[in-house]
A protein has these predicted regions:
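Short beta-strand->loop structural element characteristic of the AMP-binding/adenylate-forming
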Residues: 138-148
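Hydrophobic residues in well-ordered beta-strands that form the structural core
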Residues: 120, 141, 193-195, 227, ...
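Catalytic PLP-binding core of fold-type I/II PLP enzymes
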Residues: 153-168, 174-213, 247-250
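N-terminal "arm"/small-domain region of PLP-dependent enzymes with the aminotransferase-like
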Residues: 1-63
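Active-site region of PLP-dependent enzymes
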Residues: 200-214, 221-298
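Conserved coil-to-alpha-helix start sites within the AMP-binding
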Residues: 123-129
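Phosphate-binding glycine-rich loop
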Residues: 67-117, 130-135, 141, 208
């Protein structure tokens, strides 16, 4: 037998070594393009390291968020230079979590309520706009410029009303929109800015902050950024997405919406880290009601 007299660790390593060899032999054959060949604009980009990690995770058979999730969130946050990153199952879910975060009662008067307006564009992928419509907010569409297909920032003031609460737009095909103007507009009118960064992971933008020119990654200049890891994007998990922010309160709300609306912030498999799981009062619920099963965002 292939694993006879081997420990589980040794057997696992043997499998992973064979997976790496299989990938290099059958999946990564590189040939030159010939005249008339179809050259895709986007595709899966991977090598044996990704395939080994995929199989390693499968052998562990941990079927929900686990150590690879934790590692990825830390590395992506570090790469982007933000404090918080939350992995979700798709870029569409990332946009949904980002928008729904703005509806939280914890945001007070700045929360988005049904009937409030969100400035965006119609020329783009639908899931940038869909969360607002699904919730009952009103998208206010601004035209785009040609050939960039990004928002025409000169028309922002025309789209503003007393009901405007946020701007949620994408960087089209990796080309950043006019962040200087959009950011200044949002700050002037106390609006939330959500950057759909699904097309622009790794794109950098230079703008003035406190009298200095500062270069940051797109997706980190607004209040919340989102990414997608669907195969046509810069890197892939098959599916997958991420929501990131520097704001601790927004991060708390993002995590709550991601985890069924739960109020408790304890990670999976760990309970009562705060030491107050059973001694709180929640409205008319009995004193000591289990905080782990309190849901503050539904």
């Amino acid at each position: 037998m292939a694993f006879e007299h081997k420990t589980e660790t040794e057997a696992r390593q043997q499998i992973l070594d064979m997976v790496a060899e299989y990938c290099d032999t059958y999946h990564n054959k590189k040939g030159s393009f010939q005249e008339g060949d179809r050259i895709p604009y986007a595709s899966r980009v991977y090598d044996h390291k990704e395939m080994v990690n995929l199989v390693d995770s499968s052998l562990e058979f941990w079927l929900t968020s686990g150590r690879y999730t934790d590692e990825f969130e830390k590395k992506l946050a570090g790469y982007l230079g933000v404090r918080f990153c939350s992995l979700v199952n798709s870029g569409s879910s990332a946009n949904l979590a980002a928008f729904m975060t703005l509806t939280s009662p914890l945001l007070g008067e700045r929360r988005v309520k049904r009937g409030d307006e969100i400035i965006t564009v119609a020329c783009g992928f639908p899931t940038t706009v869909a969360p607002a419509i699904q919730y009952g907010a009103v998208p206010v569409f601004v035209d785009v410029t040609i050939p960039q297909y990004n928002i025409d920032a000169t028309k922002l003031e025309e789209a503003l009303s007393e009901k405007t609460k946020a701007v949620m737009i994408a960087h089209t095909l990796g080309n950043p929109f006019d962040l200087r103007t959009v950011k200044a507009f949002c700050e002037k009118h106390n609006l939330w800015l959500v950057e759909d960064n699904c097309d622009a992971l790794g794109t950098q933008y230079t703008m003035e902050e406190d009298g200095k020119e500062v270069t940051r990654f797109t997706g980190t200049i607004g209040d919340i950024g989102t990414s997608s890891f669907y195969p046509p994007h810069h890197m892939t998990m098959g599916e997958g997405g991420a929501v990131y922010t520097d704001n601790p309160l927004l991060n708390k709300i993002i995590r709550s919406f991601r985890d069924w609306g739960r109020d408790c912030v304890c990670p999976s498999g760990r309970d009562n880290m705060c030491g107050h799981r059973f001694d709180r009062q929640f409205g008319e619920l009995p004193l000591g009601y289990d905080h782990k099963y309190v849901y503050s965002h539904l």
